[in-house]
Structures are given as structure tokens and as C-alpha cells.
């Protein structure tokens, strides 16, 4: 019986293996590896995947694969390597940083191109993801289409398959070779994500009459794309009524939008003479700018502190120390952002009195965009209060101010 079961499983796996091999053999000439090279030495600094997507020879990949060409054009160059070993320098034609896509071109003769699938496949449809994982050569991974992610700010396809570093920018195709999405990220354990093909079609349509971007034009385009994107989602947040939840003696902002997730915890050390309840919320749709810089972050944290063991002066000392504590930062280097500049004030919103500090730092390469940190402490009680911290990355100063006000106006004191 055991032998029969093993034999049946082997027979079942043969058609799957044959299908995978068939897909790769039919479409491998349309694939490329993209190598990012240090300009002065030619040493490899990064690797990704791509594929021919037009009769003109346009190649699609991820924005994050080629971002060094935009942010550090004097330090990096790039080349493509085809499956038959041909190499050629590439030129950046266009990109969509919000959806992590880019179009490049080489001087190689145009090859057969992949076609884009025009509808969403049924849930459970088999997909074949192709790329160059860990610089180990071209590899095909079979997986399953599981539809679009729910509660996500940006459309992504949930792909059940194992994507690895180096596969970014490669296609995920149906058995007929039509592209359903572009490999973009993984959460491990066969949970991976694809950029839907409709965004590829839109970018290719825009790129078909373009002939390349200078570094200056590319950087300006990056700034414009991120600025337009933050205006759109910040307006959406400001226009959405804030839901609230109880924390201590207050009503505090809870889930600001479907794409924001929240969780809570309580902390009470045996030697600690005050109680602490923490609620944290964040989006999971951060945007990649460069290997040192992340933007699009939306995070906030509430802490309810209360005590029966401390007098008002002792509690205020603890409260002030917590208010001054640093909140985990937004990933960025000193080359990416300036130092924070802060303004502190006392304000009242409805029946809540606050001490408020609003800090901004400028994005050096993306003028007009800032990272903002709002810290506020309620001042209505002598032995309890809420400390709240709001973090926004890559927003305009005006949107930081508008949303900070919108956020604070949602607090209520319920003594």
C-alpha cells in the first residue's frame, strides 16, 4: 500500500514537472538578468530580473532593482544578461516608483516579447514565476494565484510560491506565457507578492514613445510621483472620519483606514509603580526609495499611563521621561534627510488639553517632501494620561500639519 501511494504521487508530479519545464523552454529567450555594477570597478552591487515586453525591445523590471541609477548615477551603471549569455548596457526609459516598476532598453536586437494578461485569473490558477534567485541562474517557481491583497493601499497579487532575492522584476506567467504580474516581494513561507499586469500595461503605453531619462529628469520624476501619491492618500485619510477606541479615560484614534493594522499590549513589571497599556497601528505599504531610504510610512502609538502609587510630581516625572523618549525612526541615512526641526506648544482640542511637539525633517533629494513626527501628551489628569506618537514619512509640510490637526481632533476625555 505504501509503495502504491508513493507511485501514485510520483505519477501525479510528473505532469506538473513537465508543465514547468515546458513553460521555461518556450519562454526563456524573453528573460534577462539585470546587474547593477559599481561604475569605477565594475564590481557587481546588485542583481535582479527582467523580461522583454514589447516589439521595440523594452524590458520590464522593478523600480527597486534599478533605483541606484536614479539616486546615485555617478556611482553605478547597469547591464542586462540574456539567457544565451549576451551582455549589453541598459538605458532607463521610464518608471513607476509607487508600483515598483521600471522600463529599460538595450542596444540588443528586439526579441520575442511577453504579452500581458488582461483580466484577473480565477483563484487557484497555477502561475509560473521566473527569475534569477541569489544570482544562481534562471529558475522557474510554480505557485498559485490567490487574488489581490485585501486591505492594501496599493494593489498587489498574493502569490503562493517561493520568491527569493534576485527574482525581483521577473514575470509570473500563465502556462500560455501571458504575464499576470511582476515579482516584487516575499514574506517567506511561500507568501509572495506580484505587481498586477495592468500597471505594467500602463507604464509600457507611456514608455513606447520615450527615448530615455537623464539622471536629473529621473530624479524630478521620482519626486513628482511620490508627491502626487502622498497628496492622494493623505487627502483620503483626512476625508475619512476617524474611528476611535477607549484607552484609559480617553477615546483615541484607532484604525484610520482599511490598510492600517492595529494591535495592543499591556506592560506591568513587578517593580514598576505605574501601569502601562500600549496600542500600535501602522500601514504595511511602505515605499522603497533607495537601499537606505524608505517612505510612505504611516505609524502611530498610544500609551495609557496611570498610577496609584506615585504622587502627582513623581508621575509627572515619569510622564515627561516617556514623552521625551525616542520613537523608532524611519529608515533613512544622513545623505537622504536633514536633521529634525521641532516646534513645541500647548493646545486644546474639544475637552482635551495637550502638550504637543511636531518635528519635521526634509528629504534632501526630494524637495518638498518631509518626514514628520507628532508627539502629544494629554494634561487633563494628575495620575493618568495618554501619550501618542504619529509618524508620517514622505509627506508635504502642509499635509503633515493638516493631518496632525485631524488626528488630535479625534481625541476625547471621558473622566
Where are the predicted features?
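A conserved glycine-rich beta-strand in the N-terminal activation segment of trypsin-fold
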Residues: 19-20, 37-56, 88
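Active-site substrate-binding loop(s) of clan PA
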Residues: 23, 69-70, 91-93, 106-136
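Catalytic-histidine neighborhood of serine endopeptidases
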Residues: 47, 54-97, 302-308
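Surface-exposed amphipathic alpha-helical segments
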Residues: 211, 259-260, 382-415
Amino acid at each position: 500500500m505504501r509503495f502504491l501511494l508513493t507511485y501514485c504521487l510520483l505519477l501525479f508530479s510528473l505532469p506538473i514537472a513537465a508543465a514547468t519545464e515546458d513553460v521555461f523552454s518556450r519562454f526563456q529567450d524573453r528573460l534577462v538578468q539585470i546587474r547593477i555594477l559599481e561604475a569605477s570597478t565594475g564590481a557587481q552591487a546588485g542583481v535582479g530580473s527582467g523580461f522583454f515586453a514589447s516589439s521595440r525591445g523594452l524590458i520590464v523590471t522593478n523600480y527597486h532593482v534599478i533605483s541606484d541609477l536614479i539616486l546615485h548615477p555617478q556611482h553605478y551603471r547597469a547591464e542586462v544578461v540574456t539567457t544565451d549569455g549576451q551582455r549589453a548596457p541598459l538605458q532607463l526609459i521610464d518608471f513607476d516608483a509607487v508600483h515598483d516598476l521600471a522600463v529599460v532598453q538595450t542596444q540588443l536586437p528586439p526579441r520575442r516579447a511577453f504579452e500581458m494578461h488582461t483580466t484577473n485569473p480565477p483563484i487557484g490558477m497555477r502561475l509560473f514565476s521566473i527569475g534569477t534567485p541569489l544570482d544562481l541562474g534562471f529558475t522557474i517557481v510554480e505557485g498559485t494565484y490567490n487574488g489581490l491583497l485585501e486591505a492594501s493601499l496599493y494593489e498587489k497579487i498574493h502569490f503562493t510560491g517561493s520568491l527569493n532575492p534576485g527574482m525581483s522584476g521577473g514575470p509570473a506567467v500563465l502556462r500560455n506565457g501571458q504575464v499576470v504580474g511582476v515579482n516584487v516581494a516575499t514574506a517567506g513561507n511561500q507568501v509572495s507578492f506580484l505587481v498586477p499586469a495592468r500597471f505594467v500595461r500602463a507604464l509600457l503605453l507611456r514608455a513606447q514613445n520615450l527615448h530615455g531619462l537623464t539622471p536629473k529628469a529621473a530624479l524630478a520624476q521620482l519626486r513628482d510621483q511620490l508627491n502626487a501619491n502622498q497628496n492622494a492618500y493623505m487627502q483620503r485619510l483626512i476625508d475619512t472620519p476617524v474611528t476611535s477606541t477607549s484607552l484609559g479615560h480617553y477615546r483615541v484614534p484607532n484604525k484610520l483606514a482599511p490598510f492600517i493594522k492595529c494591535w495592543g499590549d499591556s506592560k506591568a513589571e513587578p517593580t514598576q509603580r505605574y501601569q502601562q497599556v500600549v496600542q500600535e497601528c501602522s500601514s504595511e505599504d511602505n515605499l522603497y526609495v533607495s537601499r537606505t531610504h524608505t517612505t510612505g510610512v504611516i505609524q502611530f502609538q498610544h500609551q495609557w499611563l496611570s498610577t496609584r502609587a506615585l504622587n502627582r510630581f513623581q508621575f509627572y516625572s515619569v510622564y515627561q521621561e516617556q514623552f521625551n523618549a525616542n520613537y523608532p525612526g524611519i529608515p533613512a541615512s544622513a545623505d537622504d534627510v536633514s536633521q529634525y526641526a521641532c516646534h513645541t506648544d500647548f493646545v486644546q482640542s474639544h475637552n482635551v488639553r495637550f502638550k504637543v511637539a511636531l518635528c519635521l525633517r526634509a528629504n534632501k533629494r526630494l524637495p518638498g517632501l518631509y518626514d514628520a513626527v507628532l508627539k502629544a501628551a494629554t494634561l487633563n489628569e494628575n495620575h493618568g494620561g495618554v501619550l501618542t506618537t504619529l509618524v508620517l514619512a514622505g509627506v508635504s509640510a502642509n499635509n503633515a500639519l493638516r493631518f496632525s490637526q485631524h488626528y488630535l481632533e479625534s481625541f476625547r476625555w471621558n473622566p
